[in-house]
């Protein structure tokens, strides 16, 4: 099982990744190269990235699943402080989209209840939801990767992968 250890100081961080809602294949391929990765919970939250959205392949092409977040008046909100907005029916919509896109695939009936439980767990913060999902994905893919979280903002390090998964950088 993938372990999750809290809070790493800047001098011990080696491979810095963003929090991700259903990490894309590129994220997983890069993460599997390391025995451990650090999720940056103290970075400035960036909208329209893997932090709150995931793309799935539906019958009509690529469909973006977006977790709505509460707007904050602060200009620079850290990722660990981003709250999920439950005023919309996003959970139901995401689960329906996943069922519609993948309901007839092998093992769907085995995995879907676990995905449903994670999405319906209704954590307050986006990073909590993403951590549950990432840990679950790593476990199902048998990736033995230690996950840690930053306890302070890190401007940059050698293996800084926070911005390479953004569509803006492609």
Stretch-by-stretch model annotation:
Residues 2-170:
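Residues lining hydrophobic/aromatic ligand-binding pockets adjacent to catalytic sites
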């Amino acid at each position: 099982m993938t372990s999750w250890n809290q809070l790493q100081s800047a001098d011990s961080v080696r491979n810095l990744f963003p929090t991700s809602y259903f990490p894309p294949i590129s994220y997983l391929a890069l993460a599997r190269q390391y025995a451990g990765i650090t999720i940056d919970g103290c970075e400035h939250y960036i909208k329209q990235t893997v932090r709150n959205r995931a793309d799935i392949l539906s019958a009509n092409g690529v469909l973006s699943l977006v977790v709505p977040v509460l707007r904050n008046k602060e200009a620079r909100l850290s990722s660990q402080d981003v709250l999920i907005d439950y005023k919309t029916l996003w959970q139901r919509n995401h689960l329906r989209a996943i069922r519609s896109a993948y309901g007839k695939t092998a093992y769907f009936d085995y995995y879907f209840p676990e995905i449903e439980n994670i999405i319906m767990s209704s954590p307050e913060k986006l990073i909590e939801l993403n951590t549950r999902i990432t840990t679950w994905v790593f476990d199902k893919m048998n990736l033995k990767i230690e996950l840690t979280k930053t306890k302070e903002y890190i401007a940059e390090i050698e293996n800084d992968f926070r911005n390479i998964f953004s569509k803006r950088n492609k």
